[in-house]
Amino acid sequence: MKTTHRALLITATQLLAIEAGAEPATTFSPSPGWALDKAPAVPAPAAPGSKNPADPAAYEEVKMEFGIAPGPFEPTWDSINQHYPGTPEWFNQAKFGVFVHWGPQASGRSGDWYARKLYREGEAPAENHRRNFGHPSEFGYKDVLNAWKAPKWDAAALTQSFHDAGMRFMMVVGVHHDNYDLWDSTYNPWNSVNVGPKKDMIGEWSKEAKKRDMRFCITFHHEYSWWWWADAYRADQHGPKAGVPYDGHLTLADGVGKWWEGLDPRLLYNINLGEYTDGTGKSVTEIAFGQKGIFQDHQDYAKWYAERWALRIMDAIDKYDPDMFYTDGNSPEPFSATLSGSGFKCDAGRRVVAHFYNRSLAKHGKVDTLALIKFQAGNPSVGMTYEVNVPNQIMTDQPWIGENPIGDWYYGPNYTYNAVNLVRSLIEYISRGGNYACAVPIDPEGGMDPECVAMLKDMGAWMKVNGDAVYGSKAWHKWGEGNVVMPNGPLSQHQVDTPYTAADIRFTEKDGKVYAWLMAWPEDGMVTIRSLATAAGDVTSVRLLGDEGSRKFQQTAEGLTLTLVKQPCQYAWCLEVSGKNLKPAP
């Protein structure tokens, strides 16, 4: 038997009903923010791929009007840069963190972007979905959300595992491109408290991180969810279901008598924007990859969506008081009418940053927080990230985090779990002046593979030996020497097989000491560091971390040379070099 209820988004008093055997519906007082009554009318969709986006240069930037916390930070980069006091000290101290890139998309066991790819006929995630759940005209992503319960999820145990691995900050996905909020969202009924596990996941992660003095960041990836879902409005082109629409076309009225009665699919899938193309036949869903433009016939809806985008971020900020927040995308800032910001041009991103900093000042008496805009390069008042790639130079003009996933951004089979990839990534990033966050795979049930658990323990053992040279360190005057760099991309066996040699060395510094990181152990035990030749200044002592006592060394015009005997750890090794004002030898 299936239980249902009827709930108007404005006046409902009961939670959506769920399949038989699950928890009974719970009474609640829904937020007015859930309603679509203020959304502008949307024109009927034109033929797929029939329109080119308009030139952004012909459109003025829209100044948004939603309220933000009062304070000195105004929503302009000039004001934000003027008042921002600088990168918090804790950011540099933390150095190594985890990216909890997890949510219902793990249900597909198909890696990243499963929610969209399940609607792409013929692709592996779509085939997996049909085999495991059914056809997306009958069982679409909304139904995946309902089925996702994460019964093994234990935020306390997982957070402890990350902390034991040496991770000192935690980045957690609040909402991905799938448009599903993983908190008790005021502005979106498609959230983890209403649909699926019925838990405030961001609330739990935040609580456990703060118990362990881990800095907490919520990440938001929904800027382009309003056009990312265009595939959900399609239909199969072949086979027995050819022409049968997927579930993106459903409306609130279609839910009567179903488990999702009272939930409007438009608040999940948004609207059909498949009419826009990039001029080469690519659909709107490909615009983020090298394209730009304004969706000229949907500007009213775009403004409405951009406001909700911002209000959702501010809702989570106000509820969970994070140390950082992060917006995803590959454009210079959200809603910039280019790349992932295509479609609309407004100042919503700056308003959210100003709100965050003003709120921090009012609540804590100082701005000890950091906003991250993924590709906002060169702006000292916000951080940025490097996704699956390592910069080729030291970057100190703004705070930044290097980020990469083990295998892929969401759970999948046959990932390579080897702590050497975490160690090498950490060293490559911190030697260039950044922090490092690794996305550790969590399965649909909320647990980790045994091999992943073992990897984290191995990482923790390595950090016990070398952590003092990691936390609070900064880039030296030179990031390294040698010719080999770890390949870009998600972490796999490819990175494990990186052919480092004893000539590949990285550098950091802390408290007047230079740390030389050996990316490979010398087969004959002899190490020569050319950057620490006599022209670098006088070296007074050298110590191998994890090995008691100083090492005998020789400093010549050719380099600093010493012989090592016993490995105190695995993966990479650190020499602590003392001297006065050491600078790289030319």
Where are the model-predicted features located?
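Bacterial N-terminal signal peptides
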Residues: 7-19
